[in-house]
């Protein structure tokens, strides 16, 4: 008996295909896809990064806690109505284990205002879990912006978990 390999893509729905394209083999690849989708204003690609779970959550700077993919999608759809979000990861600190990863990200955000382009810095925490579908984002929490990047004086100090 001959064993034939049939590509999984042949059996996938459009939504699953989008997830497969957006989500790679590592949490880093999911994060890269997330920020690329923000910069393109691509809602489907952005949502493909999220886990298909009821309790995923997102907190935008100064905003409420959004729970569930539907609430998260609606918030990003509203944000994308004003154009893509020019958020670039400047620095990422990672804590990873077998099935979860936490990325603390310093984001540089560029926005156009009536006075011209402005830059702000946001601290975000992105949490990823390894699911049956691969690595997926389960939480995104972003701080209010600041015109100054936080200094890195504490980088050399030992970190204590509590």
Question: Which residues does each PLM region occupy?
Answer:
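A beta-strand edge to alpha-helix "cap/lid" segment located at domain peripheries
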Residues: 2-48, 56-162
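Helix-to-beta-strand junctions that scaffold the AdoMet/dcAdoMet cofactor pocket
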Residues: 51
